[in-house]
Each structure stands twice: as C-alpha cells, then as structure tokens.
Amino acid sequence: MEVYFSGTIERIIFENPSNFYRILLLEIDDTDAEDFDDFEIIVTGTMADVIEGEDYTFWGQIVQHSKYGEQLQISRYDRAKPTSKGLVKYFSSSHFKGIGLKTAQKIVDTYGENTIDEILQHPEKLEGITGLSAKNREAFVSTLRLNYGTEMVLSKLANYGIPNKLAFQIQDFYKEETLDVVENYPYQLVEDIKGLGFTIADQLAEELGIESQAPERFRAGLVHSLFQACMETGDTYVEARDLLEQTLTLLESSRPVELDPSQVAQELSYLIEEDKVQQIDTKIFDNSLFFAEEGIRSHLVRILEKGKQKSHDLETIQKHITTIEEELGIEYDNIQKQAICDAIQNKVFILTGGPGTGKTTVINGIIAVYALLEGLDFRKKSNLPILLAAPTGRAARRMNELTGLPSATIHRHLGMTGDDDTSHLEDYLDAEFIIVDEFSMVDTWLANQLFSNISSNSKILIVGDSDQLPSVSPGQVLADLLHIPLIPQTRLEKIYRQSKESTIVTLASQIRQGILPADFTQKKADRSYFKIASGHIPATIEKILGAALRNGIPARDIQVLAPMYRGTAGIDAINQLMQDLLNPPQKDQLSFEAPQCHYRKRDKVIHLVNDAEINVFNGDLGAITDLIPGKYTESKQDEIVIDFDGNEVSYPRNEWYKIRLAYAMSIHKSQGSEFPVVILPITSASRRMLERNLIYTAITRAKSKLILLGELQAFDYATQHIGTARKTYLIERFSDLLENVEEKQQAVSETVTSSASEQSYILTEENWDRIPAMIGITDTDLKEIFGK
C-alpha cells in the first residue's frame, strides 16, 4: 500500500550522481502510515538534488531492511518552496564547485524570492557577484539547470502517474525533449523505453485526453502486440488475424471500451503502407526481424556466390587427412572424412550432431587440413588465419580448450557492447576462415549482424546441435539453414565419446528420438534416477549435496539445472537452499541485500547480459571475491567484485540486475556449458515448460554424473512433447534459388520416432506403477552415486 511521509531532510546519507540514487534521513512531520510511531525514517530511491534542512513529501512503500529496519522506498516526491537558509546551504555544498557560504548568500540576496527560477531565467545577474568566476558561474548555472530541470520533469511525470525509476529512464533518453515527447507523443514511449509497456503509455495518453478510438492508439497497440508476440513465441512474424485479435484484447483490457475490429485493421493497413511493419501475404513482420531475415539471406548468398574460392582437389585433401590421422593417432570414419572434405571445398558448410558424435574431432581435422593446404604448420595455432566464435563466453572458452585456437564471443568479435547494440564494423572480420560453434543459440538479429560482417572471400563453418533449445530471442536460424539444400551440411550420428560404463550420451540420443528407455529408472555408473514429489526435491538435493561433498566432489563441479524460477523446486528456492548449505552466513561476515537474495563472499553467480566492454557475457559463471561498502568505493555505491575465470569485475549496486546466484540455473542459461555433475529436477509443476529439446539440452550438459529427480510422468511427457514449431520465413527467402520450398513445414517438424517393434524398449504408462517411489533415500544409495 502506498503511504506518504512529509517532513524535513535531516541528513543525506548517500547519493550517487550518476544514477540519482539517494538515501536520506527524514524527520517526520506528518504521515498516513498506520502504526508508524517513530519520529524519523530512512528514505531511499531515485531523485534529483535534494537539500538538507528543507521540507519534502515522499510517497512510496514501507519495506523492511534486514539491517536498518523499516524504510520508505519512494515512487515519487514533491518539495516545498525552499527557504533562503536552505538555498545558501545547497549552493555552498559539494554540488557546486567554487562557491562558499559568502558567495552563496550573495546569490540568494541578489535574486530574492523564487531564487532558482530567477537564476535560470536571468543568469546574467550572476556576473555582478564578486568572487564568482566566469568558469564557476557557467558550471553553477549548468548544474542547477540539470538538477532543477530534472526535478521539474520528474514532478510533472509523477503527476501523470509515472514512477520515479521509469521517469529517470525517460528523462535520460529524451533529455530536454522529455516533456514534449511525453505530452505530445506518449505512445512513442512504448518503442523507446524498455520496460515501460503499452499500459503505462496508454494511461498517460488517457490523462492527456487522447481518445480510446484514436488512430495513434491503435497503431501503438499493433506495434507493441506484434513485437511482444514474437518475443514470447520465438516466431519472426504473426498472422494478421492473430495480431488483430491480440491487439484488440490489449486495447480493450487497457481501457474498458468495446472497439470496432475494422478500425484496428484499417490502422494495420496504414502501418504497412508507411513501412512501419512489413507484410508478406497474411504474415505481419516487425521491421527489425523482417530485415534481419532478409539480411541473413542476402549475405549468405553474397558469400556463396560472389567471393573468391580457393580450389583444392579432393586427392590432396584426402592425402592431408591421412597425414593427420597418422600424426595424431586417430582414425576418421567415412562420414567424418567426407565432412572434412566438404568443409574445405565449400564457402559455407554446416556441421551438426549430438554429444559424443565427434564434432570436435572433425573441427580439429578441418583446421589441420586447412593449415596444411595453406602451407602452415597446424601445430602452431597462433599462425593460423582462423577465427573462432561462439554466442556465449563459456562456449567460446570451451572452443579454445578443445582446439587450442583463440576464441571469443560473436559480440566481442563484432565490437558489440551489449545485446541491443546494432553497430557494424568499419570493415569485415579479418579472417580467411570463420568457425562458429553452438549456432543453435544464435537468434535472427545476431545471425544477421554476424553474416553482414563477413567478407565474401571468407569461408564459414557453422557448428551446432539443432536438437537443442533454439535461441531465446526470435528465430531458429540453425534449424532453418539445415533445410536449405543450397548450403552443404553433414549430420554426425555415430556416438564415439563414451566408455563402456557411460550411458549419458546414449540416454541423450534416445531422448532426442522421443524414446524414454526402459532402463531410465535403473542405477547406472554415471546416472541415477530418484522418484521424488515436487515438495521433497529441496530435501533430496540437500542429501545429494552432502553425499557428493563427503565423497570429495568439489562444490563448484555440481550444477542444478531447472526449467522454472518459481515454486518449491524452482531455481530461486534451490539457490537459497544451496547457498545456505554451501556458503552459509558467518558471524560478523559482510553480506549485501538484493531484491532476490543476500550476496556473500564466495557465492557462485551468473552474468545475465552481454558486456563486451568488460569481457563478460551472458551465461558466464563467476565467484564473488569481495564485497565493498559504498563509503570505500569511487561510485559511492556498495560494490560486488566477481572473478570470472581470472577476469575480476566490480558491480556497483545499480548494476546488480546483471547478476544472480547460480548454484541452480535455468536450462536455457546452461547452453554452451558442460558440468561434471548435473542435478536435474523435473516435475509436473513445470509442465508448461517441458519439451523434448529442453530435457535433451539439460542432459547433454552433464559430463560425468547425471542425477535425475522428480516425477516419471513429467520426464515422459517432456520426452514425447515436441512443442510448437516456431514460425519463421527464412527458408522461403531462398525460394528463388531452391525447389520444393513448399515442403518446409513438413521438413522442419520432421522428427525421428520409434517404430511399433521398439515398444518393449520404451517405458510406458503401464509400467509406471511397477516402479517403487523413492520415499526415503539411504546413505548407501547416495554413496553409490558418487562411489569411486
């Protein structure tokens, strides 16, 4: 419930000028908060300059701080007219360089009432004040205009019901044009301000008198619904009928009014005519996705058709393959040899396959043959004109470990500073041969960015597993490219990387084919299954952790992967449990409170966005090495120091949204990584998330041990459930170069299924009841999991 506190600012405890975050001590004169009988309260939030000793009213929510007790977390505020005494104190503060008490008093005396307004309207009067240099005078007016102008804007936005945090985002984006945009083009905020959404902009528009039937309202609703639908489904377009239905639902839920669908359809036609959205038949595209798909097509065709291709005869390539086999003591099968030949002889080549099928072996063979053909020593990796890239930092480091060649993220190679960066290099990537791994994670936007920066004279090897989860953002680029005959490809099927006792790779292959094997519940050397109800999963994980640690397995080697964040078996709850078990609070040990947890030294954390400037990327895992209170930092904010494999990075409090605990993490975030021990809890509570590629991706993250927890029905459902195929238009864009494109949908959704003769091998519903529930897990059971 929102409450207000009016009173005098007794002290400014903390302030960060870079993001306007402040902590104040307010002496209370009045409040409507029930049962609050203290005479002062801590006030926190984003606000422009405030003056000690002056009167303000703050609105917000009372929250409980673990260390400092009750605080007011503000949503908006208002200040009373400042007093002369308060202004003198404010002008002589550290906010304004070169102004002492005497000069500040002269300024107030010169301008009299409404001092700040008068200064901003008539700054020339400052020239007559002795002791105030031209440089300090200019800086004084500039700072005052910034702070007071910001406050005026915030106050106005607050009157429109926009919370302070969003108001600062709006002010930061539009600068001096803020009020003009807000008051005249409120729906522009939907496109420009991340996190604002349509509803807030629509409420603002209603405040400003924009009618519910206004054309600009319909257009904003259409554009917003289109983009949101693509982000939620992963599709790159929406059918016009579906878009109109979704938009009508949005518009009518935002304001209680019944609308004429034909009017909304008319505005969709307007958006198409004005190139605000794109249309192909009945398909409606967001502009960025439409042109990104078209870009992928045009750049791949450019590379395939226009570049120079060095000619290497097949006999020479085969001779070099034999040389490498002899030197490295390996033997390629015929399919692997053909893959090496095809990758060398083609400008663009796709290599795909599941875990253990030899993708890395083939990649190393391609690199070595390419080096020999160029007259280079393939053992001297630093001399090779080859660029290795991957969508995540962990995947890039893994490429480096497996090939010995330098590797980096796609973002880093392209000089992209963040996920939203759409900048291009001044020149193409400097490499004759570019190898990109984990391509199933590459979305439509990033694929376009990558291909547009590759020279027509470069070769590209695309590597990935199309049966894994597709990219988080729209598109299924790898899956689509695999159905374009113009691009040569090889799928590796035979499993090599598996000892006699290893079963994880075999299980993954069976899951990929939609088979839950009859021995799924049986104890194996490298995997175990425990039938556990959702509510008992935390206690089971606690037992498993204890057993693992007693058997000498380092905590850092154990990773819990889960489908959802919420619930008793969700990521958030498991993270809290594992933090308390593996890194419990210590007496007199510093910890920092964040919205979802308390951070402690030695905590395992994950970075959630791409930050090329600090060389940390989405999915990177690190450990907290230090916690530094704000009074000791340059930013004046509490800072968390995290070590990412030797790269130490400091996170001030306003950047903590980029990290979270990672004892447990989402299956999506685990892509591109491998862990010695994976614990995978799957229950019906996460049914809406369960799909075959989700379980397959999770299982393939386990390197040595896989512990499956949960309900057998949930695992079976996930194995059988393919999920909804993403709707994309990438394959059709190659239609002028291909035949039989109309078979796309059948090709994309084609899956390998088991025959009726295999029924005895599959665990069926009839067999479920024959499996005893793991009501209690004994120490012997647990010891067997990790026994050596």
Q: Which residues fall in each region the model found?
A:
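Short aromatic-glycine-enriched beta-strand elements
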Residues: E15-E27, K631-V641
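C-terminal accessory regions
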Residues: D626-K788
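Short basic/glycine-enriched coil/helix segment immediately N-terminal to the Walker B
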Residues: D419-E432, D443, N448-S458, S670
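ASCE P-loop NTPase motor cores of helicases and related translocases
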Residues: R255, Q278-I434, L482-R497, I504-K531, ...
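Structural detector for short beta-strands of small beta-barrel domains
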Residues: M1-N16, G60, I624-T625
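Conserved helicase motor core of P-loop NTPases
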Residues: K359, D377-R379, D467-I606, D611-I614, ...
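Walker B catalytic acidic pair
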Residues: D437-E438, G464
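Accessory alpha-helical DNA-binding modules that contact the DNA backbone or grooves
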Residues: I23-L26, F36-V43, I51-W59, V63-D281
